Amino acid sequence: MQDTTLKKIIQDKSEWIRLRKEKQPLIDFKDKINKKTRDFYHSLKEKKPCFILEYKKKSPSLGIIRNNFNLIEISNVYKKYASSVSVLTDEKYFHGNLNFINIVRECVSQPVLCKDFFIDPYQVYLSRYYNADAILLMLSVLNDIQYKELSIIAKKLNMGILTEVNNIEELKRALKLNANIIGINNRNLHDLSIDLNRTRTLSSLIKKDTIIISESGIKKYREIKELSKFVNGFLIGSHLMSQTNLETAVRSIIFGDNKVCGLTRSIDIEVSEKYGAIYGGLIFVKNSPRYITKKTAKNISINRKLKLIGIFQNENINIIVDIAEELSLYGVQLHGQENKQYIDKLRNILPKKINIWKAFSIQSELPDRNWDNVNMYIFDSDSGGSNTSFNWSILNHHILDNVILAGGINLKNCITASKLKCSGLDLNSGVEISPGIKDYKKIKSIFQKLRYG
């Protein structure tokens, strides 16, 4: 949002306030305001990292972000993962509305942040009248006197305050103003560029008892893991709103793109999905202790939401295509000596919507990851499903966005594994009671660790 755009927004906001005061005078509703709010501060302090997930239909820089902007559908996803939620209420530039707050609040139990351009005391009263639990105060548009005036009213109404800063000068002001929740906006308001390093730089100047939220530009789980050491949590909006599958997008950014492999029972598919997995692995390798037939796979995967991956090893291409099509697999994972020519041939026959993943047994060095027609790579130990790991140190200093890490991942080492900058983890023997029989407690615990560890 460039300076000229921001100035225009503030000008238009002033006019909106003038007209709204005529239509809905403060005297008409001030005495009707309920001061019983949900505790915004506590929701962000309770667990780290915390997540403020945002409802945003449009922005000045991106235009329409989400065409199917259904507040109830979005809420049904957010309520499972958010610490608090944020609702854009600016009408002209973000297609928001104050009425959204009550709709959302009826659907979720979390505190609701009203995100708008607050410049007038009237707005604070109005947002609370519409049941907002917290407000955003931007130091890029408020001077210290204005900030104090608005914050005093918010506190009298028992509302939380997210104080947003964009540079070191604004941060110094926020500290002098004793802001207890500071949001660091990673977006440059001059050229709209994103710099996540701003979170690292500014957070080092903030006292430890202040809650720090990183805002804007967060898109990947590895960014969450990297920045969590500097902040308490994240406000994420545009990235999530731009995704067709919102549930998958939220899971991806909070837990990573994780797969529970070796599934043999429908209950294990349900549990894996419930606790945060995106992918489920079905093994069609006959010498595997987790082997299942096509018929069994079809029976256990009815009405599932997991993206199912079929695991094959040096299999006849026609058999792979037959199973993949009949089971509507999301992808096929090749776990043998399949070469580039084999994969090219498979790609020509396999429906385009079905992904191809290639697994490698890692020893002393990393393989080439520029194969045509491969969508994802699996880095595994010599024998998959054996609960053994390769030497993960060889992954250091590599960006591995197209790699899922496999091999011996369990409750003891999953945090270490999650910090290796892979797209996600492949969980198998480390979450089992016995081969092919998953342990629900281990699955739940490992996903909790991946989120909060």
UniProtKB/Swiss-Prot annotation:
Alphabetized InterPro entries for the sequence: Aldolase_TIM, Indole-3-glycerol_P_synth, Indole-3-glycerol_P_synth_dom, Indole-3-GlycerolPSynthase_CS, PRAI_dom, RibuloseP-bd_barrel
UniProt-listed Enzyme Commission number(s): 4.1.1.48, 5.3.1.24
Record-level GO BP terms: L-tryptophan biosynthetic process
Region spans: Indole-3-glycerol phosphate synthase: 1-257
Biological role stated in the UniProt entry: Bifunctional enzyme that catalyzes two sequential steps of tryptophan biosynthetic pathway. The first reaction is catalyzed by the isomerase, coded by the TrpF domain; the second reaction is catalyzed by the synthase, coded by the TrpC domain.
Subunit structure: Monomer.
Family, per entry: In the N-terminal section; belongs to the TrpC family.
Protein name in the entry: Tryptophan biosynthesis protein TrpCF
